Amino acid sequence: ADFYLSKERWDEAIEIYEELETIGGFEGESAEYYQKFGYALQKRKKYAEAIQAYLKADTLKPDNIWNNRHLAICYRLNRNYQVAITYYKKVEEAAPEDTNVTFHIGSCLAELGQYEEALNYFFKLDFIENNCIKAWRGIGWCSFISQKHEQAMKYYEKIIEQKPLAIDYMNAGHVAWVMGDIQKASVFYGKAITASG
């Protein structure tokens, strides 16, 4: 199984890990076996099954940062944002300046409609990683949804000065529209169409 895992042959690794688990081959083994099994499942996008393997690893070796990170990822990809946040926050305790963790906590909070709290994480990300466009996108969107239109426009304009995507022009257009600047909105919408090809 480890050989197949090292060669990124996920299906073969999963097959062997499943057989080992069926015959009791994992009994007495370390959490690492369940982590490897979970990782192979995760790579095949079998997130619910990966979560089960990672949870078994957690019972053998509680609060392992690698395991918690992968539980968070799988819960997020399975759209269980509240539980994902729980595991991301465990990782955050051990690595408070991990920019990926900060971003994903903010993103999960935004998915749950907790925009004010999400903003705090996106501002933290912008502080940790100077000129962070993905933080600016989060700030722009959460500000827009929270009716903080001037703040939203400030961040969309910063993005547009750097590396804008079509969606950035579109969102800037939405902000300009609700602020009553139809002329500016139409320019942004036009740029969104051009940028999207």
Model region roles, listed by residue range:
Residues 177, 182-197:
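TPR/TPR-like (Sel1-like) alpha-helical repeat modules
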Residues 25-28, 62, 96, 130, ...:
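Short coil turns that delineate tetratricopeptide repeat
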Residues 29-32, 66, 100, 134, ...:
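Start-of-helix register in tetratricopeptide repeats
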